[in-house]
Amino acid sequence: MRGMDEMQETLFTTVKLEDFVPADHPLRPIRLLVNQALKRLNGLFSVIYADSGRASIAPEKLVRALLLQVFYSVRSERMLMEQMQYNLLFRWFVGLAIEDTVWNHSVFSKNRDRLLEHEVVESFFTEVMRLADKQGLLSREHFSVDGTLIQAWASHKSFRRKDGSDDPPPGSGRNAEADWKGERRSNETHESSTDADSRLYKKSKQSPAILCYQGHILMENRSGLVVGAVVSHADGFAERASALRLLDCVPGTHAKTVGADKAYDTHDFVNDCRARNVTPHVARNDARPGGSAIDDRTSRHAGYQMSQIIRKRIEEHFGWGKTVGRIRQTVYRGIKRVDQHFKLTMVASNLTRMARIMDEVLTGAVQ
């Protein structure tokens, strides 16, 4: 018998959002981890928000929504609010009931900036790492470090002289053609009128110069989790300076090792690491003038070879962040907002990896 093409809605329903989410959905273990970390931030949230006045967006729901934006590559807050209107999975993860009203996108953005002001993402990052440490997933001795370029939300046409002496572009219109042939353009004399914190930089002679930031992460070598992340202005010294800054945040004065690529093979970086009781397992750059700063006393050991193998796993976080987390080109302006988004992306990458590792452990225990 042919069914009728009609829809008859009931006035009441007894189905819960929980019933729509499959029991084996990958967001289920991630949501449990997120909720455990957010519970420990209750004291911070109590300080941030006043006891009286109009209720804001719950910070816990705000953080969950921002994580969804990373997990599902949602390109804007406007699009995120639109999807939360009809996506039951999004509503379940954030904690909105079916009949709850979705927030206005501009209100959501203003509340997001409050998290930036009080460094909530940094605190959330710390709590997620504390959960990983309790599960025995973190190494306290062996680390890897690397950096990547994050293209700024600004064009070359916005890169103008600081003194305002640029000639007006020929032609008319908002996006007139520009010709910089023969003109010397540097960060000392020019800056972007769109994003003044971005810098014109290229990572190699073969690549073009772009307006960008540099993102840096410190990864522990046991489970491949990011234990430190920071965004800096892009220049030739930022990678090594940020690596030392991240190493200084590792607790304890015990001996450690850090793996890195050839860009870190400088005498200053190697000496600074050793002064911190950190053995630099840096890839040797014998083609550098003056030779490599790493000699055979370091590179002959099996631990050095192991660090060189494991350090390449750091690219998995950058790859995930650029294809899923939208850090290939940021949509935010200003180094503080870019730094917040970069840290949130690395937290999301950690959560997916932690959920997968813990699932494998449970599966192995059952077998």
Predicted regions span which residues?
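Hydrophobic, well-ordered secondary-structure elements that form the walls
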Residues: 65, 80, 104, 217, ...
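Helix-centered, glycine/charged polyanion-binding patches within enzymatic domains
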Residues: 164-168, 179, 262-340, 362
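Short acidic (Asp/Glu) and glycine-rich catalytic loops that position anionic groups and cofactors
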Residues: 8-13, 41-45, 106-108, 194, ...
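Basic, low-complexity intrinsically disordered segments
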Residues: 2-5, 9-11, 20, 28-137, ...
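A short, flexible helix-boundary coil/loop motif
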Residues: 328-329, 355-367
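Hydrophobic alpha-helical scaffolding
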Residues: 16, 20, 114, 118, ...
